[in-house]
UniProtKB/Swiss-Prot annotation:
GO terms for biological process: D-glucose transmembrane transport. PROSITE patterns: MFS, SUGAR_TRANSPORT_1, SUGAR_TRANSPORT_2. It comes from the Bacteria. The chain crosses the membrane at residues 7-27, 38-58, 75-95, 97-117, 136-156, 163-183, 240-260, 276-296, 309-329, 340-360, 377-397, 400-420. Coiled coil: none annotated. PANTHER family: D-XYLOSE-PROTON SYMPORTER-LIKE 2 (PTHR48023:SF4). It is found in: Cell membrane. It comes from Bacillus subtilis (strain 168). The gene is ywtG. Keywords: Cell membrane, Membrane, Transmembrane, Transmembrane helix, Transport. Its main location: membrane. InterPro entries: MFS_dom, MFS_sugar_transport-like, MFS_Sugar_Transporter, MFS_trans_sf, Sugar/inositol_transpt, Sugar_transporter_CS, XylE-like. One of its GO terms (cellular component) is plasma membrane. It is a multi-pass membrane protein. This is Putative metabolite transport protein YwtG.
Amino acid sequence: MKKQSNIWLYFFGALGGALYGYDTGVISGAILFMKKELGLNAFTEGLVVSSLLVGAILGSGAAGKLTDRFGRKKAIMAAALLFCIGGLGVALAPNTGVMVLFRIILGLAVGTSTTIVPLYLSELAPKHKRGALSSLNQLMITVGILLSYIVNYIFADAEAWRWMLGLAAVPSLLLLIGILFMPESPRWLFTNGEESKAKKILEKLRGTKDIDQEIHDIKEAEKQDEGGLKELFDPWVRPALIAGLGLAFLQQFIGTNTIIYYAPKTFTNVGFGNSASILGTVGIGTVNVLMTLVAIKIIDKIGRKPLLLFGNAGMVISLIVLALVNLFFDNTPAASWTTVICLGVFIVVFAVSWGPVVWVMLPELFPLHVRGIGTGVSTLMLHVGTLIVSLTYPILMEAIGISYLFLIYAAIGIMAFLFVRFKVTETKGRSLEEIEQDLRDKNGQGGAAGKQQTVGT
């Protein structure tokens, strides 16, 4: 059986990541010009930025259960529709209240897509390519962020912040149309009794009719337990939950989204003008995309855990240097350029490690019967972390200064290194069913899923 090309399948599957990235990055430039027209003060500015995250928390909290009930495809379709409505709404918002409302709607889309897209890609991909294909989500996030920075720069002189925000509706319409032609996750179909349809999709995805072993492992995993929030806290599932929540929370508290959200302000603080600051973020966005491509190339060769540990070390060093430079050499040309270089190094190591790896691992860690809700709860924790960081950054900046803030993030990075070393298991080169069986065996659950040699998943 000739294998069909799945390039477009994975592209549209990951397009939700681009929308998340765009809406995350575009606000950093738009907020510089929005303040004057909408009359924002420090409080309402923080409200506009953080309202998306409030919606994301609500969206990711509901998405896991909804996708387990209605399917991955319908959930992505709902996210695309919300992205479109939210994008148009923020572009046309006449005042702060309406802006916050539609930012919350965008957040619902973000929460849904960040839960479902990694899960969907993970369930479609063969095991030997799962890391690379699941990393497409993070690649598209970085592409979305880069595009938002470019759009910000193009419209900066005209202060056309409404165009900056409104252009997000274009790719959301593309996703809404594209998802109509995408297959449902075969694993979800099996859990909902649509075996014949699931087999046909698997045959097309794998390019072979020899999928009996893969089907056997999916069936065995599916019939082990009923899935729900209660089952997520079963003793044998708990290590996966701890790892998922920890990775999601720590990814944000290393300070990554602080750099993304407030990169223009960071550049301004070290002496750059508004346009130069936005152009600087375009450079950071470009590095982010290029290094995520490197991650896609190496993640299935090197493994998830080594990349996380490497990333921790690199980010901690960058943050310490940033802190020392701004503490002892503030307001000098050397400090300004050293800051830019260190931000670049931080992005490089993040983009080949914690950026893609966390999104890849979240759906990998959880057993089939709680994969949707487990990924949803972990993603909820990720957005809670993002919200806390975005709200506390300006407060801490004013209270203790950027140098000590970077030192706090560095200390959290050291804790993250220890967490990965002792609490996170390697998932490279194993099928989802084999990962589940290993979790069962290590925690006295037993079961049949994945006991045989698994091929093709």
